[in-house]
Every structure is written in structure tokens, then in C-alpha cells.
Regions:
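N-terminal anchoring/stem segment of glycosyltransferases
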Residues: 1-51, 76, 127-133, 259-312
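Terminal, low-complexity, charged helical segments
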Residues: 3-4, 20, 24, 32-35, ...
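An acidic- and aromatic-residue-enriched active-site/binding cleft used to recognize and process polar
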Residues: 18-21, 85-90, 114-115, 128
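An acidic/histidine-cluster motif and surrounding catalytic segment
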Residues: 46-58, 147
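GT-A fold catalytic core of metal-dependent nucleotide-sugar glycosyltransferases
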Residues: 63-109
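A structural signal for well-ordered alpha-helical segments within the folded catalytic domains
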Residues: 65-69, 148-156, 298
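Conserved catalytic core of nucleotide-sugar-dependent glycosyltransferases
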Residues: 93-156
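Catalytic core and acceptor-binding pocket of nucleotide-sugar-dependent glycosyltransferases
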Residues: 132-290
Length: 320
């Protein structure tokens, strides 16, 4: 938040959360905040019927879907205003073209992870009427599919006419050889908002910075290209320009990557010196195959949680 405020000082930045402690910390930094209504209370029925395991990452699958409700609640308070939602683990380079989203002539815009799935790492909503319509669509989709995720929901919207949708470009047209799925070409390779670069939905950031080590008990998996994603990052050449902005290199030209999905939650990105060192290291080693690093802190927390869980299960069995 401090990085965003310093990098984009003229933008109307809000931190949205249902955690009072996080809201208080942001307020202390002089950042505008909005305390969201508790989604577990507002969407009790959805939470109860959702087929995804609620114990995974403290209700991860429910919370990512419930963000639709939270955004709508925020936009009903801030009516007739465009909103560009940036996930907390998405890093924006100073080159990020926020001005391109002003008066965008569509109702909703986001990048696609694959042909079938969208991703809300960057999500543009035109106004409060569209956010309300999106919420209504989400509830209808959920009634038809209890395995619904926010990514499937956005994918369905991308392939329907329920909302006027514009896919954010994630790969230049002339780099289509890096596609895993040729069917995704029109959703991934486009210049829909006339920019000099591309937006990272998840593929480049996850490849370069690693998969969240909490998924593997502290093991950070780097340079893994996901076959389920539209883009095969192994077929791209990554570099850094003079401003230390990640670029896609092709035939002597550099294509800006405006943001990185920081799936690994690496906080070094947000300090200039540590960011420069981190990105130089990661870019230099890219294209040489998958590697793994052990994140000690995450590993120890994982072990501690496992011990606590086993103790609780043992106590529960004794009571029975």
C-alpha cells in the first residue's frame, strides 16, 4: 500500500478489507480505507453449499468468490465511479497505464488465465450498476454449479454476452508461438486498450517469482510453466529494461510487462533496492529449467500448524 501510494500519488487509492486490524494499520499510513461487511455473514448460504474445502487457506475458495459481493458493496457506496481492483499480491511497475482505464468503453475488463478461466488480479468495473449485475450473475452461476470459483465465473462472462467484456492483453500478437492453447489467441493476444505492453494475469509473475510456498510446506517452486495456463512462459525470453521493468524480449524490441502477479508473496518487490536485486537474480536464472528454494519461515509455520492440528485431532478423539 505504501508503495502504491508513493508510486501513483495522484490516484484515488482505497484499501478494502473486512479485517479491522488491517484497516487500522492502513489508516495509520494515511491510506484511504473501506471496512467491508463480513462476507461469511452476508453470503452464509453460498459458504455453506460451496463444494470447495473451507479449511484450505482459511476459506480461500469462498473468499475469492465473495470478493464479488465485497466490491459491489463498496461500489454501491461510491456510485457512478469506475473501479480498478488490484489484488493485494499484484505488483504494479511505475509504467502501469492507469490512465488507459479512465472512461474505458466497456462494462468489465480483466486478463484471462486460460481459454476457460479469467483472473481477477486486475479487474475493471464500469460503475455500481455493473458490479450489482456481476453479483447477480455470480449467484445464478453458483446455483448451477456448487464448484464455482471466481476464475470460472469470469471465464463464463468472457464467453457470454451477459456483460460487455474486454480482455486485457497478456501476450503480443507476434508472440503467439508461446501459447499452450491456440484457441485462447483472441483472449490473450490483443491490443484491446492500445498500450505499449501487456498485463500479467498470473503466468509470468508466478513463473518468475515462484508459486506460493505455503502450497508446498515452504518449498518455493520457480520457473514452472503451467500447462493449464494459456501462456507457456518457457517459450518467452524475459529481461529487464533500463528502468528495471520486466520485459518480454523479441527480435530486438522490449515489450513492457506492466505488473507481476506476486503469487509467492515476496515482499522484496516493494523496496527499490531489494526489488532490483531480486528481479536481476530471477531474470538471469529464467529459461534454465525449474528450481526450488526452501523458505524457512513458511516451512516452520507449516510444521507448527501441522503439530497443532494433530494435537487438536487427538484431543477430539479422546473426547469421543
Amino acid at each position: 500500500l505504501e508503495y502504491l501510494k508513493a508510486t501513483f500519488p495522484d490516484e484515488d487509492l482505497y484499501f478494502i478489507s473486512d479485517c479491522r486490524k488491517s484497516i487500522a494499520k492502513a489508516n495509520q499510513k494515511g491510506i484511504k480505507t473501506w471496512l467491508a461487511p463480513n462476507p461469511e455473514m452476508q453470503w452464509q448460504g453460498v459458504r455453506a453449499e460451496l463444494n470447495h474445502p473451507l479449511e484450505f487457506r482459511d476459506g480461500f475458495w469462498f473468499k475469492t468468490l465473495a470478493r464479488i459481493f465485497v466490491l459491489n458493496s463498496f461500489m454501491q457506496v461510491h456510485q457512478n465511479q469506475e473501479v480498478l481492483q488490484i489484488e493485494a499480491d499484484v505488483f504494479l511497475f511505475p509504467s502501469f497505464p492507469i490512465s488507459k482505464f479512465i472512461d474505458l468503453n466497456v462494462e468489465i475488463s480483466f486478463p484471462m488465465e486460460s481459454y476457460d478461466r479469467g483472473i481477477a488480479s486486475i479487474l475493471y468495473l464500469k460503475n455500481h450498476k455493473i458490479s450489482e449485475k456481476l453479483t447477480d450473475i455470480a449467484l445464478i452461476e453458483f446455483e448451477n454449479n456448487k464448484n464455482l470459483t471466481d476464475m470460472l465465473l469470469l471465464g463464463n462472462i468472457a464467453h457470454s454476452r451477459l456483460l460487455n467484456f474486454l480482455p486485457l492483453p497478456t501476450l503480443p500478437n507476434d508472440m503467439q508461438n508461446a501459447l499452450n492453447d491456440a484457441n485462447a489467441f483472441g483472449l490473450v493476444c490483443n491490443n484491446s486498450i492500445n498500450t505499449s505492453g501487456v498485463f500479467d494475469g498470473i503466468s509470468v509473475g508466478q513463473y518468475l517469482l515462484g508459486i506460493d510456498p505455503r502450497n508446498s510446506r515452504g518449498l518455493l517452486k520457480l520457473y514452472r510453466s503451467q500447462s493449464s495456463h494459456a501462456i507457456n512462459v518457457d517459450n518467452l525470453t524475459l529481461g529487464l529494461n533500463i528502468d528495471e521493468n520486466v520485459v518480454l524480449k523479441d527480435s530486438g524490441r522490449d515489450i513492457l510487462v506492466f505488473n507481476l502477479h506476486n503469487h509467492a508473496k515476496d515482499l522484496r518487490l516493494y523496496k527499490e533496492k531489494s526489488r532490483k536485486k531480486l528481479l536481476q537474480k530471477r531474470v538471469k536464472s529464467s529459461g534454465q529449467g525449474e528450481i526450488q528454494e526452501l523458505v524457512i519461515k513458511v516451512f516452520l509455520v507449516s510444521v507448527l500448524k501441522s503439530i497443532i492440528r494433530k494435537v487438536r485431532n487427538g484431543l477430539h478423539q479422546q473426547k469421543i
